[in-house]
Amino acid sequence: MIKLENIKKSFITGGVSSEVLKGINLEIKKGEFVAIIGQSGSGKSTLMNILGCLDTPTSGKYLLDSLDISKFKKDELSNLRLKKFGFIFQRYNLLSSNDTKSNVALPGIYAGMSKADRINRAKDILVKLGLETKFDTMPNHLSGGQQQRVSIARALMNGGEILLCDEPTGALDSSSGVMVMQILDSLHKDGHTIIVVTHDKDIAAWADRIIEIKDGNIISDTRKNSQIYELKQNLKEIKPSLKAIRDQFFESFVMSLGAIKSHKLRSFLTMLGIIIGIASVICVVALAKGSQQKILSDINNMGTNTITIFPGKGFGDMHSGRVRSLSIDDSNLLGKLDFVDFSTPRMNTSGLLTYANQSFSGSLRSGSEYSLAISGLKIEKGRDFTKDDIINSRSNIIIDQFTKDAFFKDVDPIGKVILFNKQPFTIVGLVKRDETSFSGDNLTVYAPYTTTMNKLTGDRDIRSIMLKLKDGVNAQVAEQSIIEVLKIRRGSKDFFTRNSDTIRQTIESTMNTMSLLISGIALISLMVGGIGVMNIMLVSVFERTKEIGIRMAIGAKSKDIMTQFLIEAILLCAIGGSIGIGLAYAIGYGFNVFGGDFKMIFSTASIFIALGVSSLIGIVFGYIPARNASKLNPIDALLRE
């Protein structure tokens, strides 16, 4: 079964090579009960580690069932430990966070057993070892003898064809020690190959064969009894399946969650950077979307799909006063274009509003029967202007809410006569309050442009023309057509245009750019949080080196260790991300209830992206600690306290 040929093992300490095993030749048959005895430093523990595939020889050949495993790779050795060996340690090496049955069932996870099969088998073994009342007991509530019996049960979980016992009674009192040796003797008679490493001759006396080692050499090999028992029962090999892989992944998830729970405060502090980062990003996006929607809504209220024409070369043109102003004929011509729904000339005049011995300065905006609709204003009370008002220059006026509040706070203004620059006007309508972010608090009234021309200013020129395009018309194409028509009519381009769609697109682009910029700044906090996760995971790997060694000893492969720590990092970030989303919603609720003129708008996409980003951070920043954990040498990890 086991054959060692000229096995040597050297260690380099301080640049000096020290040979611990000096050419060991040994053969152990199936079903033997062997004791390897020797003083401290004799090399017996090193020999046991090589026999159990926890360590590799410097040179020589190790044959297991006629298979040369001395050159096996790390995961191949893990597979051998999983299927062939069971380890019983002096200090038990139970996981303190797992109860008794979970400690025993642990090797079954890496063997691909289903959860039900693992637990049932673990309980069966514990019952045979007299621990039927301790299934759910934590290791720190067990006596030394009970803990060692749990360790034996764990070694038998995957069959334990070869049991390697390192000073199995070293930490026990004499009666518990005898009980453990009786169990090992019984297992030998069941056909298990037992290899005990000890310095105690009384313990070695239980074995049928005693091998003494000194200074790295075997100095004696004596047999008391040549009887060999055949293994009566062994587990069938479990073939990997999709369900087994899924169950193993789930168990890694559960173990990772348990590790996080066991250090609640540290885990929360680790998540804090992720929480703040995710909440910041989501809030920034929600604020950007809310403010963008508010501004675009304001633009819509001002009139969508509109084009306005002004005289001059642009706003602030010092020579615009010399430019021949736009005319009513220009407005009428543009109103007849196929793609124009309607057109209205516009004029603005400042003056004094007077009613019942009260006077306030205000603005008079003049236009056609379409001007209020084009501007996105709606009548709250009364009526809009009619064609008759325009044709006959009626002295009718429509007031806004500020004018009503100033003169008619508790009175219905419809039908009342108000003066503008001493000219009487009858109030026929009241517009709804303009809630846009562009509205001011000035008193504003509206009149037919013909009335303003004929009864107030006498000026035939207009300051702008506003066009409402038909639905489905491309605003940019329409704008170019309007420019060409006016250039031909006026002989030159002494005017400029303002396209509401262009303004909308510019604002959207600006808001998106600002949102990206601020989100980029918020992402920095996510990166800082990710680095924090990596630091804590590196500390966790260092603190749990012993646990990693135990898992590797019972058969965990590098990928199993890496998966567990990677899942742990992803979980930390995902939980932190979820809390961050909750925090963002709480902030949004408070803002929307007590905030200003606009609401924070959360999008489903931003939430999924936030969760995805937090998980990605877990993968990226958890990779290095997980890789470090997976690269640990089993024996080095086991020996670290």
Swiss-Prot record:
GO terms for biological process: response to antibiotic. Residues 2-240 form the ABC transporter domain. Its EC number is 7.6.2.-. GO terms for cellular component: plasma membrane. It is a multi-pass membrane protein. It holds the Pfam family ABC_tran. Homodimer. Belongs to the ABC transporter superfamily. Macrolide exporter (TC 3.A.1.122) family. This is Macrolide export ATP-binding/permease protein MacB. The lineage of its organism: Bacteria, Pseudomonadati, Campylobacterota, Epsilonproteobacteria, Campylobacterales.
